[in-house]
Amino acid sequence: MKNLKTIKKTLFICSALSYGLVLAQEKSWTDGLKLSGSADVFYKADFSGKNNTLTSFTAPNNSFELGMFSLKLTHNTGKFTTTADIGIGNRAEQFNYNESDSKLLIKQLFIDYAATDKLTITAGSWTTHVGYELLDAADNDIYSMSYAFSYGPFFHTGLKANYLIGKFNVMAGVANPTDLKSSFGKAPDGSDYKNKFFIWQVGYAGDKLSAYLNGQQGSYNPVSSNISQFDLTAAYKFTDKFKLGVNATNVTLSDDVASGKQNWSSLVGYLKYDVTDAVALNYRAEYLDNKDNVLSLGAPVGNTVFANTVSATIKSGAFQLKPELRFESSSEDIYVDKDGNAKSNSANFLIAAVYKF
């Protein structure tokens, strides 16, 4: 009888130790795990009754639309951190316009190695360093997108290194041609892209001022075209309530066979004023120079566009409501009126609901 009690006690102790070990292992694993995400939906109406939107993600007219559900997981172990960022919906599909199948879901997938407290090496696929605006609606002050964002790079897949020098940083890397998760068999003739792009950034992040000079250069070999992009983003916080942002980008396309170069550029200004902790007012003004007609914006000749967006963000906990009015005018008739006739200006109203966790 004593032996039976001893056996039971031993089994109980072993079970308790095993359970404690499992809990310790689980706690150790979950300690390095972070989970975040967002979801957004919107309604947009063009005042002409026609779709006159020429930028990303908000084209449908007079329609309730699903934006994107996003789920981001990061896990850290020592000097290594892995990030998996998954998106489902219209934004994710347009973001991954070159991809198909399961790659449509992958916004970001990369591994960071903190070689020192100043040097970080990253391998995988990540959203671009170029530009002021971001893919996720919850991370932008204004829901609709600028031309600079819509026709600039979305993401890069490759290898990069970032080095911190006080408040400055220097980043350099090599990547597949813009917006390609893989360069294998992706050329127009079904062959492989043979060259990699060079990507880089020099940045400063101060208490009130932040500024980043960004770029990408590369060849689309075996295609004869090449691209060079220089981009500047900056933000200045005048007070705790008032912020100014600027984005200037210039893209030059050249060809190894044909002579001459083509260019497009954009200058964007952003103003944000926090009325209260729950309400912010936003304004964006953009001047797009598409005189070489690189972007083919609804006309057989080149044009310029001046776009103005007035927006508000109303917050309640994790929820955001974003109403906006957008007005555009062009040097050419790139929009249409209610009868389908070409015209040189457009306007629309949009309201979006965003939840971030």
Predicted regions and their residues:
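Beta-barrel outer-membrane channel/assembly domains of diderm bacteria
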Residues: 14, 21-121, 159-166, 170, ...
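A short hydrophobic/aromatic micro-motif that marks alpha-helical segments and, especially, helix-coil
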Residues: 23, 92-93, 180-181, 222, ...
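Surface-exposed coil loops of outer-membrane beta-barrel proteins
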Residues: 24, 42, 47-63, 92-108, ...
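Transmembrane beta-barrel outer-membrane domains
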Residues: 30, 59-66, 100-106, 150-154, ...
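Active-site-proximal loop/turn and secondary-structure-junction residues that shape catalytic pockets
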Residues: 88, 127, 176-178, 217-219, ...
